[in-house]
A protein has these predicted regions:
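Active-site-adjacent alpha-helix immediately C-terminal to a catalytic or transition-state-stabilizing loop
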Residues: 89-142
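Helix-loop module immediately N-terminal to the HCX5R catalytic loop
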Residues: 82-90
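Flexible, D/E/H-enriched segments
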Residues: 142-149
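Active-site-proximal alpha-helix that buttresses catalytic centers in soluble enzyme cores
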Residues: 1-83, 118-130, 147
Length: 149
C-alpha cells in the first residue's frame, strides 16, 4: 500500500487537482521505490489515475516493462468504503492466485479505507511512504513500514 510521493502543494496549484504533479523530492522518492518494489517482485501496479500517483509508480513500471492499472475507485473524488473494499479484495484474491506482488498507490484521504479493508489500523503514511502487507491464505500475517528517502 503506497501513498503517492511528495506532490506540489494544493495551495500553489491552480489547475485540476488530479493533474497536480510531484515535486522534485517526490520524483526522487519515486525512483527510490524501484529497488524496494523489485525486492517484493511486484508485478501488478494498481493506482489512482491522478498524475501524482502515476508519477510515483512510473519509474518502476518502466523498469519492469509493466503497465499501470488505473483504478478510479481509489481517487479522492470517487472513493467509498464499498468501492475501495471491492478493489482491495480483488487485489488480495489475485495475490493469492498468482503469488506475485502488487502495489496499490493512492491518496491520504483514501488510505484509511484501504487499511480498513485489510483489517488494519491506519498508520497515517507520509508522502512516499508504504506499508508492505504480507498475506497467507488471504489474511494479513505481517506488515512492514518503509519510509521515503
Amino acid at each position: 500500500v503506497q501513498r503517492h510521493a511528495r506532490a506540489r502543494a494544493r495551495s500553489t496549484w491552480r489547475g485540476d487537482d488530479r493533474e497536480r504533479p510531484l515535486q522534485q523530492v517526490g520524483r526522487s522518492q519515486a525512483f527510490d521505490l524501484v529497488p524496494v518494489l523489485a525486492a517484493y517482485d511486484v508485478r501488478r501496479l494498481a493506482t489512482s489515475p491522478a498524475v501524482r500517483c502515476l508519477e510515483t509508480l512510473t519509474p518502476y513500471a518502466e523498469t519492469i516493462g509493466a503497465d499501470l492499472e488505473l483504478v478510479e475507485e481509489v481517487t479522492e473524488e470517487a472513493a467509498t468504503e464499498g468501492a475501495v473494499t471491492k478493489v482491495v479484495t480483488g487485489l488480495v484474491e489475485d495475490l493469492h492466485t498468482t503469488r506475485r506482488g502488487a502495489v496499490l498507490c493512492t491518496h491520504r484521504p483514501v488510505l484509511p479505507l484501504v487499511f480498513e479493508a485489510l483489517g488494519l489500523d491506519d498508520p497515517a503514511l507520509a508522502p512516499g511512504e508504504m506499508v508492505v502487507v504480507h498475506l497467507r491464505k488471504g489474511r494479513v500475517v505481517a506488515t512492514e513500514r518503509h519510509l521515503p528517502h
